């Protein structure tokens, strides 16, 4: 007669065996699941883009948000009467809402303030002063009623010395009847105060393209003076959302031309504002660029 285990002993053996099998399967599944997940997480942490965005949205397009990269543009008041001299006061605050007071000097200034109406008219390039408490202030006149966009373009310096370039944007309002001006047609030549300015180069989507500006005064070539660390300064704004494109200038003249490297993020129309200095006076030539 064959020996048989008691029923209770058999049940206990089955339970223990099931537990052991579950543990072994769980260990194997855990090894399979944890390996790739850990590797992916490490790759994201180590290989992610550590360059802070200039604002929000596409790479190279800034000024679309009031907060980005842990910094916030905080106006201290913002009521303006069209055509009346006023003052714009603001702070750049960190993630803890503390005013930032350490900025790197970029293009000869710690902060550049660009102001333009939403129809891309009335361009102003200003350089505010900062008080010890981190409050920036600058005289500002909004000449026409409407909604205006103010851009703060700066590079903050963190406690460990890291430099964080950011461009933030905020709307300012001058109450009154707003009549938008149509954007001028695309043209490679503009005239300002007797100077004729033209540019060469055909910006393409996603490609760094050289763009060169030449200034003429009648039949002569005026002597361009250094301005903001180069021989000219270029701001490019996108029609529609007023995205602010970052442009890299060449510090030296290319013959008699002022050269920049420009990348456009997509099709549409853009407004180019080229600042140049002659005989101590800064002027701005404006162009419309159409990208198919």
Model regions and ranges:
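Extracytoplasmic/periplasmic copper-protein system
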Residues: 2-3, 28-80, 155-205, 209-216, ...
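N-terminal Sec-pathway targeting helices
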Residues: 4-18
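Aromatic sugar-binding surface patches on proteins
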Residues: 122, 131-137, 253-259
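Residue-level recognition of secondary-structure-to-loop junctions
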Residues: 130, 137-144, 264-266, 276
């Amino acid at each position: 007669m064959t020996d048989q285990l008691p029923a209770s002993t058999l049940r206990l053996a089955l339970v223990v065996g099931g537990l052991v099998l579950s543990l072994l399967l769980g260990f194997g599944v855990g090894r399979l699941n944890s390996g790739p997940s850990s590797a992916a997480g490490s790759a994201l942490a180590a290989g992610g883009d550590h360059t802070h965005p200039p604002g929000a949205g596409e790479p190279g397009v800034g000024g679309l948000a009031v907060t980005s990269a842990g910094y916030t543009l905080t106006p201290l008041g913002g009521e303006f009467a069209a055509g009346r001299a006023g003052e714009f006061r603001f702070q750049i605050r960190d993630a803890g809402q503390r005013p930032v007071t350490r900025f790197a000097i970029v293009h000869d200034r710690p902060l550049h303030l660009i102001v333009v109406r939403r129809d891309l008219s009335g361009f102003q390039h200003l350089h505010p002063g900062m008080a010890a408490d981190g409050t920036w202030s600058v005289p500002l006149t909004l000449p026409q009623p409407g909604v205006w966009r103010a851009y703060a373009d700066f590079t903050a310096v963190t406690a460990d010395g890291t430099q964080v370039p950011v461009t933030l944007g905020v709307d300012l309002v001058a109450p009154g009847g707003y009549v938008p001006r149509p954007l001028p047609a695309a043209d490679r030549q503009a005239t300002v105060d007797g100077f004729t300015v033209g540019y060469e180069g055909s910006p393409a989507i996603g490609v760094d393209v050289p763009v060169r500006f030449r200034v003429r005064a009648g039949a002569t070539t005026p002597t361009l003076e250094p301005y903001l660390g180069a021989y000219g300064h270029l701001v490019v704004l996108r029609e529609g959302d007023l995205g602010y494109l970052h442009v890299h200038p060449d510090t030296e003249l290319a013959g008699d031309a002022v050269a920049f490297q420009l990348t456009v993020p997509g099709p549409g129309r853009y407004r180019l504002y080229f600042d140049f200095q002659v005989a101590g006076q800064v002027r701005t030539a404006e162009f419309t660029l159409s990208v198919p």
